[in-house]
Amino acid sequence: MRGVNAVQTRQTAEERREGVIAAATKEFAVHGFAGTSTMAIAKRVGVSQPYLFQLFGTKKDLFIAAVHECFETVRLRFESVARDARRASDDPEHLLQQMGMAYCDVLTDRNMLRLQMQAYAACDDADIRRVVHDEWTKLYDSVARASGAEHPRRLPDPR
């Protein structure tokens, strides 16, 4: 029986969704798309398997959400680092170097690197292949914009 002062906090659907993606990332990183069971993900996060399908529809949709989150984490980190590094220098080489070091930091979370590898391994599936391609394109474009490397250096006007 709960005491009068007991407070029960309920997660919002978005918080629960984020928790499921985090749990799925760990499972998919280790076992891959084909080798991961939705039951293992549900158990890891403490929800029912039907609830996973209520949130994501299919296992593939959940995998794609985890892949998207992985790439978005890297992309946002690069953009943040580039903004901070730009205070010291707006040289594209400097900014790219700082983003490269940030990537090494991101990869200390082995699940991030493993999930990226598992995403590539799952590219036999056309939907997953399209998502991986789109995420890499967004990442490339983001790095190019954030670093200024997308534009050739302009020569001074000789006039």
What are these regions (language model features)?
Residues 65, 76-110:
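Hydrophobic alpha-helical connector segments
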Residues 151-159:
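Short terminal interaction segments
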Residues 72-75, 97, 105-111, 125-149:
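Amphipathic alpha-helical packing segments from all-alpha helical-bundle domains
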Residues 1-13:
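N-terminal intrinsically disordered/low-complexity leader segments
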Residues 16-19, 23, 27-61, 65:
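Helix-turn-helix
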